[in-house]
Amino acid sequence: MNQPASGSAEWGSLLGDSARTGGLGLKPARDPKGIRWRIRLAKSVRSAPVLGGDLLYVTCLDGYLHAIDTKTGRHAWKFNAGAPIHSTPSISGAKILFGCDGGQVRALERDSGRKIWEIAAGAEVWASPVVQGGKVFFGSADGNFYAVDLETGAGEWVQTLMARIYSTACATAGGVYFGCSDNRIYCLEPSSGKVVWSKASGSVVDSSPAATGDTVLVGSEDFAAYALDPANGSVHWKFETGLGISSSPAVGGGMVFIGSKDHHLYALDVRTGKLGWKVNLQTSVTAPPVVGEGVVCIQADGVFALDAATGKVIWRAALGRSLQSVPVLTGREIYLTGIEGIIYALE
């Protein structure tokens, strides 16, 4: 896993790393004092920002991947994908990768925006690409899950599942895990794409799994959060919430944090699924949380920082009802995007 060290300016993929654990190791304990800059893009943002060095990368329904200088809030460059983009980009070394509604997945030079390679799926790619072991993994609404070579974009394998895939995968050396609209969670062999196991839930699985230790964690629209054995998919535990879950889990301090459309953020013991606490955020919680050192941050009608042990609100930045993405925390700044197309830098 490529978790950023404290104080570093790297948050290179959805939920921070290829295992999608949402763990930062930073403590954003202070209430942000104000907005350092904000910019409005031409259309809505339905993805999460990622951070690499001094550039913040944001995809948008205007069809562009935007690279924003974090010091000034001005564009460093932007790339026209030719179709709206729901996919959160992923940084791998000098590359940045993303999918789009036209079905293409592209790798660009992250400093310049120059295209390195492009590959086409048969339908939109809303999932964020995940990089592991020199391969790029992603699912598509065409019902296929793809693995391509990181350096060239050449196809490695395709697994056909005949159901739309909007879940972003998590990947480890032992497996690639993702949800599917056929109500199942899958584990594929990274080298071949062979289905190692699949586990049925009661409804669509658009949540992105997180892999930690001997557990894969994921939510389902059947109202439940699941902890599965990564080797065979057997259920360690299942926790029922009041409505469907499209939020992805985050893991830290032996707890898993996950939001539900029943307006609550839940803290559960990773080993047992026992409820530690829940807090009512007064709105449907579809954004994934992120975990700092003793702090959980989540966007829901603004951004909340909660005490990870108790769920008590430490601070809240009220920026409007349109925030349902994933905040990027550096220890000094917080970067946020909203469905109205506004990007915020708080300090």
Language model regions located:
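Blade/loop signatures of beta-propeller domains
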Residues: 2-35
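Repeat-blade elements of multi-bladed beta-propeller folds
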Residues: 8-18, 42-64, 79-106, 119-146, ...
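Short, solvent-exposed mixed-charge patches
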Residues: 1, 346-347
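General secondary-structure propensity
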Residues: 2-4, 258, 313, 317
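Short, positively charged, low-complexity/disordered linker segments
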Residues: 34-36, 292-316
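A short beta-strand motif characteristic of beta-propeller blades
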Residues: 35-39, 74-79, 114-119, 154-159, ...
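Short loop/turn segments that connect beta-strands within beta-propeller blades
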Residues: 69-73, 109-112, 149-153, 189-193, ...
